[in-house]
Amino acid sequence: MTNTVAALKILNAGVYSTIQDRGRFGLRHLGIPWSGVICPAWQEIANALVSNPPEAAVIECFEGGLQCQAESEPLLVSVVCSDDALIKSGPENTLSSSKPNRSYILAPGECLAIVSTGSARLAVFAVAGISVNEHLGSASTYAKASLGGLGGSLLQAGDEIHVNHAKRATGEAPTPVACILPDELQYQCSTIRVVAGPQFDHFSGNGQHTFSNSDYFLSTEVDRMGARFDGPPIEHRDASAKDIVSDAIVPGSIQIPGSGLPIVLLNDAQTAGGYPKIATVATADLPLPGLQRAGSCFRFKLVSIDDAINAIGHVQQLIEHTISAFTPCVQTDLDSETLLKTNLIDGVTDGLDESASD
C-alpha cells in the first residue's frame, strides 16, 4: 500500500469483529462464499457519514466491546447501529457517552468504543480512507479460509488498520454529521418476505401452510453462516423429500432438514447443500435474522419475485433519503459526567436587586 500510514489501532476487538465490504462474488463455483456485511444499508450509510465510497470496507462488530484509537493523525470515523447502542468516545482513560448514528473526529490518542450494540446484535464502524488489501477481489474476512481482512482472521487487540493520507481528517477539520435511521432501516420488523424456493413442492400442503402461517422464533444458533429457527415443524411431502442431491445454495436460502425447522443461510454460508429449500429470503429482509436477537418472533410471508425486487429498490430509496438528510452535529455531547464536572453557576444574585439586571 502506498501513501498510507497505520492510523487506526484496535485496543479491544470485542466479541467478534471483522473487516467486511460488499462481498466476494463470482467464486461460488469454487466453493468460496460471498461473505460481506450482514447489513449493506448500514454499511452504505456509515461510509456516507465519512465521505467514503458506498462499497468501502467497514468493521462489523457483533455484541460490542470494540475499542479503536487514532494513532498519529486525526481520523474521521462513524458508527451506525441501533438507537439504544452504547457508544463512548474521547481520551482512552476518560471516555464519555456519545450518540450513535453519526461521525466523529478522533484526535491522535483519542478512542471510540462500541460498548454495547443495544437491541441489534451488531454495529458498523467506518473510518474515512480505510485501506485494506483485497483477496480474490474483496477485503471481506472469511476466517474459515483465512481470506480478506487482516491476515484472514478476526480483528485482535494490537491490530492496525491503514488509512489513506488524502482521506485523514487533516487540514480544515470536516464537520461531523448525524443521521436518523427510518424505522425500516432499524430492522426490527417481524415479517420476513420470501419467494418460493426450488424445492417448494417437496413439502405437503400442510407443510407449506405451516411455513407461511406460523410464528418462528430465532434460536441461539445464529452466526455469519446462518440462523436456525424454532417453531412448528414443517411437514415434508414424504420421507424421500427430506433430502436432495446436493445443489447450489445462496445467502437467503431457507433449508428444511429432517427436523422440519427452518435454517436461513447468511453471508458466510457454504455454497452447496443437500436439504430441500422451501423458499429464499428477499434481499431487502436478509439482514433481519442476522441483526435481531435470540427469541425474536418472525413470520415468513410469500411474495412474488417482482415484489422482492421492488422491496430492495425501496430500501435503496430509504438509504438515499437518509443520506440526503444528514445534519451537522453539535460538537459537544453533554452527559451527566460532564455536567457534574462543569461550573454552571458563576456567582449568586438577588432576584430583588434591580442592579442585578444592569
Language-model features, listed with the residues they occupy:
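Conserved "landmark" site that anchors the functional core of diverse proteins
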Residues: 1-358
